[in-house]
Structures are given as C-alpha cells and as structure tokens.
C-alpha cells in the first residue's frame, strides 16, 4: 500500500512537471515562463492590429501557439524593422517574429528556426502602371523595407530604392504616387490590395521565392530545438492550417522547410 502511495505521488509530481513552464535556464530564456517575441504590428496579414486593438496575424497566431506548446506565455515586443537584429543581440527579447526571410547573410548573424512559411516577392504598382515585370524597374523609384531582400533585388534591377521602416508606409506612398512601385511579400501584397481596398495591382512574375523564419540569437540551441519541435507538431496535427487558412484562404507551410543552421 505504501509503495502504491509513493507511486501515485511520483506520478502526480511528474504530471505537474510536464505542465510547468519551461525554465529560463532550460531554454536560455530572458525571463522564466515567458517567450518574449519581437514583432512589428504593422505588416498585414503577418502582424497587425485586430479591430479590438489586439495583435493578430499569421506570425502572431503561429508564435502564440508555439509558446503555448512550450508552456510559455507569448509576450510581444513591438519593434521597428531596422532595430530588430540590434535588439536581439542586446537581449531585449528571445525571438524575432517579423516576416523575416531566411537568407545566407542573415544566417551568419542569427539562428533561424526551421522555415515556417513559404512565399515570394512580388512587385506592387498602381493599377494603371506601365510596369509589368521586374525588367521594367530600371530607372524607377521603388520602395522596400530598409536592408531587406527586396531592397537588394530592386537595386540589382537598376531601380532607385527608397527605404521604409514599415511596409504600410511604402504601400501608402505608392497610392499617393510618391514612388513607382514597391516590392513586397506576395501574401502581404494580395492581402493589402483586397482588404485595405487600395487601388493597386501586382505584376504576374515573382522576383524571389522565399521561406520565412523565426530568428534566435546564436548560442541558444535548446530554444531552437524546442521551437522546431513545436512548429513540426503544429503542422502535423492540423493546427497550423486552421490558424492560417482562416486568415488568408490557404495553408502556406513549406513542403520542405529550410533547416536550422547554428
């Protein structure tokens, strides 16, 4: 009887431990019980404000679910695009979740969790623009996020690049006629044109094919592993599809996610 009591007690302790928040030491978190995540809040449908003022969007939903799977509280930190990497290196948050493309150059500075979304770059123009493809960008003024993949693409095409700290500012400048085009994520562009009722259009060609990743400061392998497992579980059990299809009408999970490189 005594042994049974001990067994029950051990089982109860194990159950509590399984539900307990991961410790800061285990996952190299800045604060125990919290997953502090940098996001912009200005890039629909990835990160934006819902009608009630709360944060919503693809990356908000997915990262909130990741935190839940890790028994952590999702804690957003609103940061402008050009300060994201600096803040991560300064330990202002644990993860960057800001529609960041996984590139070889960025992999030298941060560790990305496995790719969580597949998309591509598209050119957005005014509805009556003569720009029909990337070949037409030469000599034009093209808006793009500062230090982004799309800014480099526009520059390589011979365009004069105007940098922005928020995608929404570039789209509005395009509507106002201050730039000739902007290059943005295809999902974001389609969402803005449809839901913000902007008089804009996208050209047919993709200027890039990309995967987006959650960025983590180098030297935190346990946190990377934990996020990768949570992402895989979310996709496998159908939760990812439910979270994303509801917002954009399809499942953007990569068929072959780019793997983490320390």
List each model region and its residues:
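Extracytoplasmic small-molecule ligand-binding "clamshell" domains
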Residues: 24-99
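Alpha-to-beta junction loops
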Residues: 36, 72-73, 90-98, 140-141, ...
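Periplasmic-binding protein-like
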Residues: 117-125, 190-232, 250-262
